[in-house]
Amino acid sequence: MEIKMKNNFETVIGIEVHVVLSSKTKMFSSSKSSHTDPKNTNISPIDLGHPGTMPLPNKRCIEKAIVLAKALDMEIEKNISFDRKNYFYQDLPKGFQITQQFHPIGKNGKIYLDENNFVDIERIHLEEDTAKQTKEDDGTILLDYNRSGIPLIEIVTKPCIKSSTEAGLFLKKLRRILTFNDISDAKMEEGSLRVDVNISVKPIGSKEFGTRVEIKNINSINNVEKAIEYESNLQAEQILKQEEVLMATKRFNDKTLTTEFMRLKTTNVDYHYMVEPNIFVRKISDDFITDVIKNNYTDIKSIEADLLKNNVSQEFINLLMDDYELFQKFKFINDEIKDCNEVIKWLCVEFVGSLNKVNLKLKDATDFQLNQLLKMMKYLLKDASINAKQGKEIVKLLIETNKDIDTLIEENNFKQITDKNVLRPILEKYVEANKPMLDQYDSRPERVEKFFIGMVMKDTNGQANPNVVTEIFNEILKLNK
């Protein structure tokens, strides 16, 4: 059935993304913008919708929206205005939401998925969040107004996405733009990036769209992909069985990996949009836009190009670009070490791997541990005072004990032996005892060299500097020719 559905139907997908902007204050008030503080502590009369209060747009949020519009190659609206979206709900104290219905700050943009494919962005607009509601067991609804007025930007695509894979890639590319440009931390698990997906299925080649189903508030990119796959197959199966596909709002159950009915969409809701009379239209100049972009915009393509130029594999480029926190730590170390692949090896593989072994994540690592990792890498790569095997053990112990590198080296006797006067007699001892092996050097150079270096490393409990041992070995070879 699944193969038949895929061969006969195509999926049409549109995505709406709500992003919490990185801002110290709310969209229209001076209240602190944070939803992690004790409930109902970051509030003001404006956030509570008291009569007579006057909203004042957050300039920093407007600047972030301009940067996003630039990153999405959009037309930037120079007359900044706001509108009222009128509806009643418990979490909306004013009875309306301030948004940008008539003149969105950006329109007609795109995100490239690769060189040839892109997703059309219809519009981006600024708006305020609603209060957070919690339902008690007895049906009582509690409201936390800390979230009321938190600045949001909504990104709306055109219905041009064709598959779950494209949808997932679009969200990854968007998240890169948001994090690298300090627009948002875009943490889906914390609600900073919320995704609604509109899905319809139609026979291949049909000019008419199928019935649209909206899936609300999906909490991870992986779940977005799974929700699209399930709902697409469900709709195709309904069409094949000649069952009606209902226009509905659904949620995704990440335990059963299915979509669940919430409510029917019977009619288009009329929100009676009107211009917000308490906020004057503000005209922004070309010079202002240029300055904002110059001071805030980060070109992600140039970062990726630099990594490629430094022979970083596409796999690790994706790893760094998809995790801004990891990239920041990578950049911090690489600014000193100046060797991308060595930093990736020790940070992304050894350091993160050691964290995972004790059930920790990168966010749990301290600045002290990161600085100690940098110090260890300097000892290894610049001073050659420790070797790679010792480095791996040091990273492991750093995570387990949180001790400084010098203490770990001292306690574990990891100080490398680099003195030729100490190492030469050890190597000569093994050369003298294994003359037949040395005689095989011309025919099997790598094997012979590895054998003698290995003997010295074993004799010194891994403390001999292998580069110094190699130098001594080459000197002995010349004397024996």
From Swiss-Prot:
The superkingdom listed in its UniProt entry is: Bacteria
Give the region (Disordered) as residue ranges. 29-50
Q: Which molecular function term from Gene Ontology is one that the record holds?
A: ATP binding
The record's listing under Gene3D superfamilies reads: 1.10.10.410
Catalysed reaction, written as an equation = L-glutamyl-tRNA(Gln) + L-glutamine + ATP + H2O = L-glutaminyl-tRNA(Gln) + L-glutamate + ADP + phosphate + H(+); L-aspartyl-tRNA(Asn) + L-glutamine + ATP + H2O = L-asparaginyl-tRNA(Asn) + L-glutamate + ADP + phosphate + 2 H(+)
Name the EC number(s): 6.3.5.-
Note one Pfam family from the annotation: GatB_N
Q: What class of enzyme is it?
A: ligase
Keyword hit for Translocase: no
Instruction: Please verify whether the record's keywords include Endoplasmic reticulum.
Output: no
The record's section on PROSITE patterns has: GATB
- Keywords in alphabetical order, please: ATP-binding, Ligase, Nucleotide-binding, Protein biosynthesis
Name a single GO biological process. Answer: glutaminyl-tRNAGln biosynthesis via transamidation
Biological role stated in the UniProt entry: Allows the formation of correctly charged Asn-tRNA(Asn) or Gln-tRNA(Gln) through the transamidation of misacylated Asp-tRNA(Asn) or Glu-tRNA(Gln) in organisms which lack either or both of asparaginyl-tRNA or glutaminyl-tRNA synthetases. The reaction takes place in the presence of glutamine and ATP through an activated phospho-Asp-tRNA(Asn) or phospho-Glu-tRNA(Gln).
- What family is reported? Belongs to the GatB/GatE family. GatB subfamily.
Among NCBIfam families, the record links this protein to: gatB, PRK05477.1-2, PRK05477.1-4
Q: How does it assemble?
A: Heterotrimer of A, B and C subunits.
List the HAMAP family hit by this protein, alphabetically: GatB
Please identify the protein, giving its name as recorded. Aspartyl/glutamyl-tRNA(Asn/Gln) amidotransferase subunit B
Q: Which organism is it from?
A: Malacoplasma penetrans (strain HF-2) (Mycoplasma penetrans)
**Highest classification ranks of the organism:** Bacteria, Bacillati, Mycoplasmatota, Mycoplasmoidales, Mycoplasmoidaceae
Q: Provide the gene name from the record.
A: gatB
